[in-house]
Amino acid sequence: MAMTYHLDVVSAEQQMFSGLVQKIQVTGSEGELGIYPGHAPLLTAIKPGMIRIVKQHGEEEYIYLSGGVLEVQPNMVTVLSDTAIRGQDLDEARALEAKRKAEDHIRNSHGDVDYAQASAELTKAIAKLRVIELTRKAM
């Protein structure tokens, strides 16, 4: 049996996941993080994107995160996010529309603030589409 640790993924609305996992992948403020059993304690910001969860028996789950905080403790990892949405619950049409609007906004931006906001929205839309794609492959 593979080594595991306990993971909690919590959004402002609800607990999205609680259980034993083999590993997770998430994008931290300094880049991609792979958290395996026995990882050194860590507290870091996470960027908008996805968390890839490899559960106790090898099944995979993908959850979109709007950003947040990752805390790694011995035998326990916690992810706190304002928004967390399971891959199968994401609306592809809405994500595609958000991506299109963000791209239009970038093309028509008139200043750093407009561009930064549109770029952040584009990043979120692309992350949602990636979660949808990976969720389909895992099913």
Swiss-Prot record:
Keywords: ATP synthesis, Cell inner membrane, Cell membrane, CF(1), Hydrogen ion transport, Ion transport, Membrane, Transport. SUPFAM superfamilies: Epsilon subunit of F1F0-ATP synthase C-terminal domain, Epsilon subunit of F1F0-ATP synthase N-terminal domain. InterPro entries: ATP_F1_dsu/esu_C_sf, ATP_synth_F1_dsu/esu, ATP_synth_F1_dsu/esu_N, ATP_synth_F1_esu_C, ATPsynth_dsu/esu_N. It is a peripheral membrane protein. GO terms for molecular function: ATP binding; proton-transporting ATP synthase activity, rotational mechanism. It comes from the Bacteria. Belongs to the ATPase epsilon chain family. The keyword Metal-binding does not apply. This is ATP synthase epsilon chain. Transmembrane segments: none annotated. It comes from Pectobacterium atrosepticum (strain SCRI 1043 / ATCC BAA-672) (Erwinia carotovora subsp. atroseptica). GO terms for cellular component: plasma membrane; proton-transporting ATP synthase complex. It is found in: Cell inner membrane. Produces ATP from ADP in the presence of a proton gradient across the membrane. F-type ATPases have 2 components, CF(1) - the catalytic core - and CF(0) - the membrane proton channel. CF(1) has five subunits: alpha(3), beta(3), gamma(1), delta(1), epsilon(1). CF(0) has three main subunits: a, b and c.
